[in-house]
Amino acid sequence: MSQIKAILVAVDGSPNSDRAVQHSLDMVASGFATEVHFLNVQPGLRGAIASFVSREQIDSYHRDEGNKALASAVGLAGKASVSAQVHIGVGRQGEVIRDFAKKLDARMVVMGTRGHTGLSGVLLGSVAQDVIAHVDVPVTLVK
């Protein structure tokens, strides 16, 4: 099996997300990958709410919520003694995941099949479908 450098794991704090994190950590432990990046994507604030709060407050909110969602993944990586980079993006999930995969030169995206998206999603979940449609690297879905 050939080794890849970077894996990008989309993290939302859901049980399926935790399983995706564990899968990526197992790939690092087995020598399949050398680097793992955890990414949480926060939805952008729009409309009236964005006009009543400062940019600093919005950034702080996204950072706090992103760190909450990433906490479990960071804990799992620590237990596995794997060093992981954490990232918080803002915007449409599929687009942000695609852009981070390119930016990090990730050779694989790993994510849960359904997470915290309001609706449970149909079949794979809307975010997973969006990512599969837009990234140029293999996508591993974990349920």
Where are the predicted features?
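Structural beta-alpha unit
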Residues: 2, 75-109
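Small/aliphatic-rich secondary-structure junction motif
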Residues: 2-52
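Amphipathic, non-transmembrane alpha-helical secondary structure
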Residues: 18-26, 71, 98, 102
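General small-molecule cofactor/ligand-binding pocket signal
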Residues: 37-39, 85-89, 140
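Short beta->alpha linker loops
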Residues: 53, 88-92, 114
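A short acidic, glycine-rich active-site loop
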Residues: 55-68
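Gly/Ser-rich helix-loop-strand patches that form or flank binding pockets
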Residues: 99-143
